[in-house]
A protein has these predicted regions:
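N-terminal topogenic module of multi-pass integral membrane proteins
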Residues: 1-59, 63, 198-201
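Short juxtamembrane and helix-loop transition motifs at transmembrane-helix boundaries
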Residues: 3-12, 31-42, 68-71, 92-104, ...
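Core segments of alpha-helical transmembrane spans in multipass integral membrane proteins
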Residues: 22-29, 46-58, 72-90, 109-121
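Structural signature of hydrophobic alpha-helical transmembrane segments
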Residues: 40-52, 100-114, 137, 165-168
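C-terminal ends of transmembrane helices
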Residues: 56-66, 120-128
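Alpha-helical membrane segments in multi-pass integral membrane proteins
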Residues: 109-121, 131-152, 159-180
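Short, highly charged, low-complexity non-transmembrane loops/tails of multi-pass membrane proteins
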Residues: 188-203
């Protein structure tokens, strides 16, 4: 009797580039609205759903196949964030009726606070990935600080501006991170540097 065990390994590509591209696109479009360059949310919602949510969820699922807990948690956490935010916008716009359009913005502020906590400990993890990702997470921290405070009505104009410019910064660095992930792998060398891990917590 043959007792040999066979292991089948299914290889899949690194999904980080697509996940970061999704993040870059949704934050670029959303920041344009926060900065007052564009108005309304109707054309922000599709990008929130398909790029912010679905693209990052795809990256989350595929990172889990790579046994990448950090990537799975990061992409999954923010994918569900954009799903929830897009749904919240639809409620507020009255898509589901006038009664559901009557909302308490402070509930959303508490959600932003929860995501601020999430982002802070994920920032610690990003320190041991690479420096571009660390910068993205620091900007995400500032985004959620701004969103939390402005939604609570604390120094509303200043904190809204903090959120807006932080979100634009996230878009810029995420485009770079996505490009680096694609091109470095494609060319088999460091085409766009992303910086080494800090080496503080993980030796």
């Amino acid at each position: 009797m043959n007792n040999e065990k066979q292991t089948i390994k299914i290889a899949s590509a690194d999904p980080s580039a697509l996940g970061l591209f999704g993040l870059a696109m949704v934050t670029l479009v959303a920041s344009s609205q926060k900065l007052g360059i564009t108005t309304g949310l109707s054309f922000v919602i599709p990008w929130a759903v398909f790029l912010g949510a679905f693209a990052q969820l795809f990256a989350c699922i595929n990172d889990s196949k790579h046994e990448n807990t950090f990537g799975t948690t990061a992409f999954g956490g923010y994918a569900f964030f954009w799903m929830a935010v897009a749904t919240s916008w639809l409620f507020k716009m009255g898509v589901f009726g006038k009664q559901l359009a009557v909302v308490d913005d402070k509930q959303l502020a508490f959600a932003f606070l929860g995501y601020l906590i999430f982002s802070v400990f994920m920032t610690i993890g990003a320190m041991e990935t690479h420096k571009v990702l660390f910068v993205i997470f620091v900007l995400i921290d500032f985004l959620f600080i701004g969103l939390t405070l402005s939604t609570f009505g604390i120094a509303e104009h200043a904190t809204h501006q903090l959120a807006a410019y932080s979100e634009l910064g996230i878009a810029i660095f995420s485009f770079y991170g996505s490009a680096a992930s694609v091109l470095n792998k494609h060319f088999g060398r460091v085409f766009l540097p992303v910086g080494k891990p800090f080496g503080i917590f993980k030796k």
